[in-house]
């Protein structure tokens, strides 16, 4: 009986070497899986062709774009999910990819699943945690990490096995899905190196933006449903948000990020649609939620982002947090106007049938609130600080 390993396959050097290593070093027949979460269409086709040329038993291409948006991105929006200023585009997709790989592994009766992650990055945690949660009986193999291979050793092995290598090695490592694009490697590893314009593909150079644009985002119970009055299907809405914000240079992110294992890394991202939608969503929450709800939700949102980053999407705590978040989102319905210009996204208007803002109460020209009645409240505001100061003076 054939021993089968299912490989999460991207078509890059790491996973292509994994494919052959699984055959040579581990004795497996390989089934490859590419999960489409918004990569370029031509890349998806190239991956399939390459897998077949390298002799896989079978290759699966799974279109998971709609599931990614509805079950992952929309939940991240409702949670204002960020990690150290980054909208979690790469991290958010990994549990879904790993879950799909597990489903194929169970379908084909595989003994093992494999990935091409190295030992220094975050993805090893994200893939393996999901796999162990969903299918603890499956063996996990990470050839690049487990064999401690360097990039040079991988290239040498690829030449030996006839794995196609571009004549010019890719300068940067790029990961792309509907929620964003990450660029790393080469000179970008120097935190003082100024990124060249060539690394960007989704966003226009902000200094070249000559005309501002006001875009209106409509939300229903925390989920974006329309842009500029046009109702859009989930995948199309995210694509549209990326397109509109990207042409104004919105969503360029350059940060020093704390990885799971403790390393600090320099990361560059393009997340135009994410920045636009998260900015609008947060503004609408400020209009409809109470002060105490907002304060507590900030804590929940921060924890939610950390769970995503650490690969704990399927942890029960995430479901618990969703229960609270979903309750708050019942009133997050309305529209937000965002001005886009020169790399910035600035909220300039918001409206909701659930708004807690009252023009009559807040206006200096109205008498809905009897100002005299506030004197007593003001008198005892900061009472503990006053008592503390009195005690100090007695000493």
From Swiss-Prot:
Main localization (coarse): cytoplasm
UniProt keyword annotation of Iron present: no
EC number(s) per entry: 6.3.4.5
Highest taxon of the lineage: Archaea
Residues that, per the record, bind L-citrulline: 86, 122, 126, 173, 182, 257, 269
Keyword annotations: Amino-acid biosynthesis, Arginine biosynthesis, ATP-binding, Cytoplasm, Ligase, Nucleotide-binding
Top-level EC class as recorded in UniProt: ligase
Single GO MF descriptor: ATP binding
GO cellular component, one term: cytoplasm
Cellular compartments annotated: Cytoplasm
Reactions it catalyzes: L-citrulline + L-aspartate + ATP = 2-(N(omega)-L-arginino)succinate + AMP + diphosphate + H(+)
Pfam families to which the protein is assigned, alphabetical: Arginosuc_syn_C, Arginosuc_synth
Residues that bind ATP: 8-16, 116
Gene Ontology BP terms: argininosuccinate metabolic process; L-arginine biosynthetic process; urea cycle
SUPFAM superfamilies from the UniProt entry: Adenine nucleotide alpha hydrolases-like (SSF52402), Argininosuccinate synthetase, C-terminal domain (SSF69864)
The family this protein is said to belong to: Belongs to the argininosuccinate synthase family. Type 1 subfamily.
UniProt protein name: Argininosuccinate synthase
Species annotation: Methanocaldococcus jannaschii (strain ATCC 43067 / DSM 2661 / JAL-1 / JCM 10045 / NBRC 100440)
Lineage start: Archaea, Methanobacteriati, Methanobacteriota, Methanomada group, Methanococci
Gene assigned in the entry: argG
């Amino acid at each position: 009986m054939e021993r089968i390993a299912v490989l999460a396959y991207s078509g890059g050097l790491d996973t292509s070497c994994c494919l052959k290593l699984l055959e040579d070093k581990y004795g497996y027949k390989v089934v490859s899986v590419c999960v489409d979460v918004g990569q370029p269409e031509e890349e998806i086709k190239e991956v399939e062709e390459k897998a077949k040329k390298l002799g896989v038993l079978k290759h699966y291409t799974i279109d998971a774009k709609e599931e990614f948006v509805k079950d992952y991105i929309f939940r991240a929006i409702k949670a204002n999910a960020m990690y150290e200023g980054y909208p979690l585009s790469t991290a958010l997709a990994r549990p879904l990819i790993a879950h799909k790989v597990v489903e194929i592994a169970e379908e084909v009766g595989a003994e093992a699943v494999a990935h091409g992650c190295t030992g220094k990055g975050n993805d090893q945690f994200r893939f393996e945690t999901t796999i162990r949660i969903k299918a603890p009986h499956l063996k996990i193999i990470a050839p690049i990490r487990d064999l401690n291979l360097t990039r040079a050793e991988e290239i040498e092995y690829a030449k030996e096995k006839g794995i196609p290598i571009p004549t010019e090695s890719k300068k940067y490592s790029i990961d792309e899905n509907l929620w964003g694009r990450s660029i790393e490697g080469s000179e970008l590893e120097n935190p003082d190196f100024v990124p060249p314009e060539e690394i960007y593909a989704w966003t226009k150079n902000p200094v070249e933006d000559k005309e501002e644009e006001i875009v209106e985002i409509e939300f229903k119970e925390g989920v974006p449903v329309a842009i500029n009055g046009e109702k859009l299907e989930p995948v199309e809405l995210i694509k549209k948000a990326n397109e509109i914000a990207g042409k104004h240079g919105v969503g360029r992110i350059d940060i020093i990020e704390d990885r799971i294992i403790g390393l600090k890394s320099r990361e560059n991202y393009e997340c135009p649609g994410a920045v636009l939608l998260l900015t609008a969503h947060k503004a609408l929450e400020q209009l409809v939620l109470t002060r105490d709800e907002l304060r507590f939700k900030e804590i929940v949102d921060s924890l939610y982002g950390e769970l995503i980053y650490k690969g704990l999407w399927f942890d029960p705590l995430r479901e618990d947090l969703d229960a609270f978040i979903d309750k708050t989102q019942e009133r997050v319905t309305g529209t937000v106007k965002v001005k886009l210009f020169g790399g910035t996204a600035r909220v300039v208007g918001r409206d909701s049938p659930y708004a807690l803002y009252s023009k009559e109460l807040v206006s200096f020209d109205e008498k809905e609130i009897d100002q005299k009645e506030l004197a007593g409240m003001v008198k005892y505001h900061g009472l503990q600080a006053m008592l503390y100061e009195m005690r100090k003076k007695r000493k």
